[in-house]
Amino acid sequence: MGAVVGVVGCGRWGLNHLKTLSELKTRGLISAIHACDIQPRKLVEASKYADTFCTDWQTLVTNHHLDIVAIVTPADTHHDLAISLLDYCRAVFIEKPIGLSREEASSIIAKVQQTDSKLLVGHILRFHDAINEAIEIITTGEIGELQKIEFNRITNRQPPDNPNIFEAMAIHGIDTACYSFGELEPSTLSVSNLALNANKYPINAKLSLTFPGMKEACIEVGWNGNEENREIKYFGASGTILVETSTSSKLIIKTLGKERIWVIDNSELPLMKEWQYLLQPLNNASQQAIYPPPEAIIRSIKWIELANHKIQNTSTELDESIE
């Protein structure tokens, strides 16, 4: 019998969750999909993939016995929703960021542990086949010791309402850098090339992270780009690996002036792999109950908090210069 899944939040990314779940339903891994969004108009799109639709989470949990609930709503709602929904399901999938502060993240993790539940936070690039293949190649020493990571995520989409580029995109770069360096904790962070919208929300930025061992990561993220740029480049002592995150099946390796393309067979989209991971039996002793590990979840929030703090100072300086 497949799992019964609820999805709270049916916006652009919520619909991607519903599409993925619909495919998993055809494979027999899911028996029912129940969608929820506070906007009634979302019914039209959601009903293409979900068995039912409602406009509040209380109705969702009252009408259905749920195994898993995905929270795909604005970040400022994640904490309260997660704390409430953990009383009604065995697992939660919370899109990143898990919350807006380390306190919120710790509170959710504590509730997961208290209820003996499972938690998956949507650090999706940890499930990207090409990134994981690149890390495997790096461990063989083919490009030498990993020294630098360049992470680019520029989209030609317009920013959403009340945007925060750190919570929406930079968090992917921070987590991917730490993950690629073997869960290494950064030492310092600086923010440059900052662009704010009319309401002083950050919409473009470049983050520079340093790590122990003279390692570094440069993260460039933003909306309103001229074209899409979704590249991650790994720089080793004797070569490079380029990953296009828009595809999970290919990477380009350059060593000693030679280039080769590595094609990954039977690659699946990262969101599909996230759901497959979460759908493994809850009593699977080999699987972590919380993923990424709690310290990695909190680490990402910590550095996003620091980035937000830095731009508050920058915003004040901009105001003073205008005056």
Where are these regions (language model features)?
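N-terminal Rossmann-like dinucleotide-binding module
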Residues: 1-48
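Active-site loop of classical SDR/Rossmann-like NAD(P)-dependent oxidoreductases
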Residues: 16, 41, 262-276, 292
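Beta-loop-alpha module in the N-terminal Rossmann-like domain of NAD(P)-dependent dehydrogenases
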Residues: 17, 49-111
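A short helix->loop->beta-strand "cap" motif at the edges of active sites that frequently abuts
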Residues: 30, 88-90, 115-117
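C-terminal helix-rich "cap/oligomerization" subdomain common to oxidoreductases
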Residues: 68-73, 212, 277-323
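Hydrophobic residues in well-ordered beta-strands that form the structural core
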Residues: 94, 119-121, 243
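Contiguous beta-strand/loop segments that form the cofactor/metal-binding neighborhood of enzyme cores
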Residues: 168-248, 275-285, 322-323
